[in-house]
């Protein structure tokens, strides 16, 4: 069993239960899934860009991402409907906990001038979104093989009903929020 999942079951869930006075164990918020999305805007001109993004996301997440395609044509962006414009991967279960553990303990401390993640990135429904400016913070990415520095969005979806519950859950997991 993953270190983070073990910690959740033994320490975090009982602590949340006492703090929020839940009647049942099933009411305790837990992390449902993590979605990593990488938008590749230059894939419109350069078809090879999407391949490198897919490869990098595979290394980061440990599973093959889905190529996202344009829903509508937008003439201003020279975009046609159905063109590949990004890649996303949804992590659940064991891989999700592995990724979150790696993100908190290894990758985030490698960000330049890191002072913690924003407390304001909750969506009102208990989900947390985190933007990363460069993929180089992940140890799986080889610096020499990177053609272009790309950012990504990481969405942590929880079963929490409010932002306060989700914030407490992520704080207990070890997410380094700004003071």
UniProtKB/Swiss-Prot annotation:
<dbReference type="Pfam" id="PF00281">
    <property type="entry name" value="Ribosomal_L5"/>
</dbReference>
<dbReference type="Pfam" id="PF00673">
    <property type="entry name" value="Ribosomal_L5_C"/>
</dbReference>
<dbReference type="GO" id="GO:0019843">
    <property type="term" value="F:rRNA binding"/>
</dbReference>
<keyword id="KW-0694">RNA-binding</keyword>
<dbReference type="InterPro" id="IPR031310">
    <property type="entry name" value="Ribosomal_uL5_N"/>
</dbReference>
<keyword id="KW-0699">rRNA-binding</keyword>
<dbReference type="InterPro" id="IPR031309">
    <property type="entry name" value="Ribosomal_uL5_C"/>
</dbReference>
<dbReference type="InterPro" id="IPR022803">
    <property type="entry name" value="Ribosomal_uL5_dom_sf"/>
</dbReference>
<keyword id="KW-0689">Ribosomal protein</keyword>
<dbReference type="GO" id="GO:0006412">
    <property type="term" value="P:translation"/>
</dbReference>
<keyword id="KW-0687">Ribonucleoprotein</keyword>
<dbReference type="InterPro" id="IPR002132">
    <property type="entry name" value="Ribosomal_uL5"/>
</dbReference>
<comment type="function">
    <text>This is one of the proteins that bind and probably mediate the attachment of the 5S RNA into the large ribosomal subunit, where it forms part of the central protuberance. In the 70S ribosome it contacts protein S13 of the 30S subunit (bridge B1b), connecting the 2 subunits; this bridge is implicated in subunit movement. Contacts the P site tRNA; the 5S rRNA and some of its associated proteins might help stabilize positioning of ribosome-bound tRNAs.</text>
</comment>
<dbReference type="GO" id="GO:0000049">
    <property type="term" value="F:tRNA binding"/>
</dbReference>
<dbReference type="InterPro" id="IPR020930">
    <property type="entry name" value="Ribosomal_uL5_bac-type"/>
</dbReference>
<protein>
    <recommendedName>
        <fullName>Large ribosomal subunit protein uL5</fullName>
    </recommendedName>
</protein>
<comment type="similarity">
    <text>Belongs to the universal ribosomal protein uL5 family.</text>
</comment>
<keyword id="KW-0820">tRNA-binding</keyword>
<dbReference type="InterPro" id="IPR020929">
    <property type="entry name" value="Ribosomal_uL5_CS"/>
</dbReference>
<comment type="subunit">
    <text>Part of the 50S ribosomal subunit. Part of the 5S rRNA/L5/L18/L25 subcomplex. Contacts the 5S rRNA and the P site tRNA. Forms a bridge to the 30S subunit in the 70S ribosome. Interacts with VmlR. In stalled ribosomes contacts MutS2.</text>
</comment>
<dbReference type="GO" id="GO:0003723">
    <property type="term" value="F:RNA binding"/>
</dbReference>
<dbReference type="GO" id="GO:0022625">
    <property type="term" value="C:cytosolic large ribosomal subunit"/>
</dbReference>
<dbReference type="GO" id="GO:0003735">
    <property type="term" value="F:structural constituent of ribosome"/>
</dbReference>
């Amino acid at each position: 069993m993953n270190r983070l999942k073990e910690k959740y079951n033994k320490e975090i869930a009982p602590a949340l239960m006492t703090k929020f006075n839940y009647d049942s164990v099933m009411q305790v918020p837990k992390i449902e899934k993590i979605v990593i999305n990488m938008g590749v805007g230059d894939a419109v001109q350069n078809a090879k860009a999407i391949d490198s993004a897919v490869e990098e996301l595979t290394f980061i997440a440990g599973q093959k991402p889905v190529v996202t395609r344009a829903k509508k044509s937008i003439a201003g962006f020279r975009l046609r409907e159905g063109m590949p414009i990004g890649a996303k991967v949804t992590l659940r279960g064991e891989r999700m906990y592995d990724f979150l553990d790696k993100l908190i303990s290894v990758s985030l401390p490698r960000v330049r001038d890191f002072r913690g993640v924003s407390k304001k990135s909750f969506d009102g429904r208990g989900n947390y979104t985190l933007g990363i400016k460069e993929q180089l913070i992940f140890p799986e990415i080889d610096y020499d093989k990177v053609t272009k520095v790309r950012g990504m969005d990481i969405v942590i979806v929880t079963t929490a009903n409010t932002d306060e519950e989700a914030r407490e859950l992520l704080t207990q997991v070890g997410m380094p929020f700004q003071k």
